[in-house]
Each structure stands twice: as C-alpha cells, then as structure tokens.
Amino acid sequence: MGEPATDAWTGPMAWTGPMVVLVGAPGAGKTTVGTQLARRWGVGFRDTDADIEAALGTTVADIFLDHGEEYFRLAERRAVAAALADHRGVLALGGGAVLDAENRTLLAGHRVVYLEVGVSDAVRRVGLARDRPLLVEGPRTRLAALLRARRPLYAEVATVVIDTAGHEPDEVTDLLAAALGPLLAGGSEPDEAADAAGGSEPDEAADAAGGSEPDEAADAAGGKR
C-alpha cells in the first residue's frame, strides 16, 4: 500500500492538525473506517467520544444519563478543540459534534470527510444501540430524524462527501484513500476529489437534505448520536 501521508507531511506544504477528520451519523462507519485508514497510513487513530470517556471515567451513555446532554456537549467541545490542535493522524468526531457552532467553526480549514449513510444501513449497523443514548428508543425513527436534521451540517463542514451505501468498510476505506490522496499531495481541488470518490458534493448534499438552518437542525436533532 502507498502512504500518501509521507510527502504531504514533510514537504513544503506540510499540514498541521489531523490528516483527516471523519464526520457522519451513527452507523456511518467512522470508527471502523478511520481505524483501517490510520493503519494503512501508519498513523494514529483518535475518537473524541473515547477521549471524553477516558477524561470523565465513564461511558457516553452514562454521561447523558447522569449529567444530561448539555454537560456532554461542553465536554465534547473541549475534546474536539484539543484533538484538532494536537492530533496528527485520523480523527473521528461523535455523530452530534457538528451541532455545536463552535465545533463547526473549528473545523474550517481542516480536511473533513462526511461519511454518508442511509437510515436502513445505519439501523443495521448500530443494532439495538445500547451505547447510543439518543437511539435507545425507536432507533429507526430516531435515526431518520437525526439524519434529516444533521445532513446540512455534515455537508457544511465537509471537504469530501463519500456515500457508504452498498460498500463494506474496506471498500469505503479505499474510496476515502483515493479521495484524499490528491488533497494530501496538494493536487486536485476538493470537489474533484469528491467526484473521484463517488460521493456527492457538499452543496448537493445540503440541497438534498432540505437545507434546514443550523439552529433548526440542532433543535430537531436533540442530541448526540
């Protein structure tokens, strides 16, 4: 396997911050694909949900249960800021991180990949969702609402959009590596990379989602995952 990170990391346009940031709904495959991509490139993988759990000594589900969503979002904001500042590998954000306007601002200028997933695929992948506090009751209905609300926000922060429908994790990893290779090498523009990856354009994704305003999306989503 090639390692497109090497030249980009040491050359005249060496990048600061994560090589790539993955966003998407629960079931999009951020952790699985991110881990595979990091292994392929020989870099570290980091997940802000795992960072929060390590810092607070408990699970995300228990944080929601014991302290509420507002408390979790504050912890998440701090985790996102810290990871964007000091991680140099592949970074995955929690599904609801884009609800926070400060997080979206922090993502500007980073290579952000939106892993797009449909409701059926997401439900199949998350199962009973015991570790996802906002999906415990009626996961299909809840996921559909989350996707409607968050798609415009994912698209807003995305450099590249990759549709995961019909693809196994290793195939998504291949698409992601192909899309990011030119960007890491300082080559094609983000929209060209998105075309190469088979993903929709961020603006098109937002239009398809109905283009709701960020505040409306946050209200409709009601939480994290």
From Swiss-Prot:
Mg(2+) binds at T31. One of its GO terms (biological process) is chorismate biosynthetic process. Monomer. Belongs to the shikimate kinase family. Substrate binds at D49, R73, G95, R150. One of its GO terms (cellular component) is cytosol. The gene is aroK. Its main location: cytoplasm. Pathway: Metabolic intermediate biosynthesis; chorismate biosynthesis; chorismate from D-erythrose 4-phosphate and phosphoenolpyruvate: step 5/7. Catalyzes the specific phosphorylation of the 3-hydroxyl group of shikimic acid using ATP as a cosubstrate. It is an enzyme of class 2 (transferase). Its EC number is 2.7.1.71. The keyword Amino-acid biosynthesis applies. InterPro entries: P-loop_NTPase, Shikimate/glucono_kinase, Shikimate_kinase/TSH1, Shikimate_kinase_CS. Disulfide bonds: none annotated. It catalyses: shikimate + ATP = 3-phosphoshikimate + ADP + H(+). Residues 186-225 are annotated as: Disordered. It is found in: Cytoplasm. The keyword Magnesium applies. Keywords: Amino-acid biosynthesis, Aromatic amino acid biosynthesis, ATP-binding, Cytoplasm, Kinase, Magnesium, Metal-binding, Nucleotide-binding, Transferase. Binds 1 Mg(2+) ion per subunit. This is Shikimate kinase. ATP binds at G27, A28, G29, K30, T31, T32, R132. One of its GO terms (molecular function) is magnesium ion binding. Its cofactor is Mg(2+).
